[in-house]
Amino acid sequence: MRHSKFLVVSFLALMTLSFTACSSSDDDGGKGKIERPKYLSDAARYKITTQGSTWKSLELTEDGRYFIVYDGSVSGSSSQDNDDVIVSGSYEKKGNRYVLNTVGELTITANNNSYELLLTNKGKSLKFSAQKSGTLPSNKVNDELCRTWVFSKCYIVVKYDGKKVYNASSTSANELYDGFRSAINTPEYKDKLKLSQDKEEDIDGLRLLRTVTFTHAGSYYVTTTDGREDLMNYWKWINANELIIGFSENEDQTSVHDQAALKFDNGQLIMVDSQSKGREEVTITMEFQPVHTDR
C-alpha cells in the first residue's frame, strides 16, 4: 500500500527506539495532567459485514472523533490505486444518536451478536450490519494514550565524533528538514554521515504528519496534510508497565514489525529515537499535544 509504505517509514520508523532513550510514564502529578476522554463508554470500532459495501469499518474514538475506512478495492471507491480511503472528523452524542460532522447522524442498534448501523443525511440513509471489535480495558495508561495527538515540535541532534553537526528544534517540520539537509550535506560531512542520510527521507515525511490517534480497539490512525496519505493500522502493548508498544498491519497482530517506547510528560506524548552508527549519533525527539474534541 502506498500510504502504508510512506508512513511506516516516516512516522513509525522515527518512533522505533533504543529503549534506553526514554523513561516510563510521568504525568507530573497534576500539572499538565491529561484529561479523561469525553466518550470513553461510546468508543468502539465496528467492522462492516454487509456484503458488497465500500465501507470496511467505522470507529468512534474516545475523544470525539470518527474514522470511516473505505475499501479501495471495491468499485465505487475514490481510491486511485486500491488503497483504503479514510474519512475522519469530529462527532457529538445527542441522546442515542451520534452526529458525525459532514457525514450525518448515526444510530447504532444491538442485534443479538451483531449491530445495525443507520446513517442518515439530508433525507438519505445508509444501513449496515457490523461486528464490534474487542476493546482494551479502561485504565490509567490506556486512557492516557487512547486519544488524538497532534504533532507539535521536533528536536534533532546530529553528532560526529562527539561534535554537534546539527542541533535544532522547531514546530515547523519544513524548517527542520531544510536545516538538517543543509547541515549533513556540507563538504566536510556529506561522505561521513551515512546514518543521517538514511534518515533524510523519514524527516522529510514529517512535513506531512498531522495527527496520530490511538484507540482502545487496538487501532491507530495517522492523518496528514495530504489526506491521500492517511492510514489505519494496529497497535498492542509489548510491555504496558514500561510503555512499550508494538505496531502491526494485521489485526490479529501475530507479527509486530515495529516497536516504540513512550513517555507522558506535562500533558504531552513524547517519543525519542536515538541511534548510533560508528562515530555518528542521531537523536530525534518528537512531541505531541492532545487534541481537544472540537478540533
Segments the model singles out, each with a brief description of its role:
Residues 2, 23-24:
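Cys/His-rich metal-coordination motifs, chiefly Zn-binding "fingers/knuckles"
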